A protein has these predicted regions:
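Glycine-rich segments within core transmembrane alpha-helices of 12-TM secondary carriers
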Residues: 145-158
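Extracytoplasmic
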Residues: 16, 22-41
Length: 164
């Protein structure tokens, strides 16, 4: 009896799999660090706990507003372009922190976080199904579970990378 072993990821897709899986780590880290930002904004900008809760709210409003447009974009242009758009928005939102510091404006930081949230939702909307396409359909759930485990790893590791 000849057994054919299904590879989790086809050889030609190892590099894209590793790159996309690293994005799962990055967005896990990005979402988890919101709590750290919350405390720092409270201290450095002397804002209330209630006002600082806008950090999470603004980021997740980006998820709410951008999820359907992200899906439409990915349907029209494909997973890879969706990943590029998500990374572009994520990077743009992150770079907006630089002038935000000079302006010392909490509202400007909230706009930055909204753009980051939009980038994250596009990344997630593109990366999840893209991972399933990188090999045999029979092993797609295993690939997705492996990639998703890096999301949790990113969420947990932020504490070790952000401590003074």
């Amino acid at each position: 009896m000849d057994k054919v072993k299904n590879r989790l990821v086809r050889k030609e897709f190892v590099v894209p799999f590793v790159l996309v899986t690293s994005l799962f780590f990055i967005w896990g880290f990005a979402r988890a660090i919101l709590d750290v930002l919350n405390k720092h904004f409270q201290m450095s900008m002397d804002i209330t706990l209630t006002r600082s809760s806008m950090i999470q709210a603004t980021t997740y409003i980006g998820y709410f507003l951008m999820a359907i447009p992200a899906g439409m974009f990915i349907t029209r242009f494909g997973y890879r372009r969706g990943v590029v758009l998500g990374l572009t928005l994520f990077g743009l939102g992150s770079l907006m922190f630089i002038p935000g510091e000079g302006l010392n404006s909490f509202d400007f930081f909230l706009v930055s976080l909204f753009v980051i949230g939009c980038g994250l939702v596009v990344l997630e909307t593109a990366a999840n199904p893209y991972i399933t396409e990188l090999g045999d359909p029979a092993t797609a759930p295993s690939r997705l579970n492996l990639a998703q485990s890096f999301n949790g790893l990113g969420s947990v590791s932020y504490t070790h990378l952000t401590l003074p």
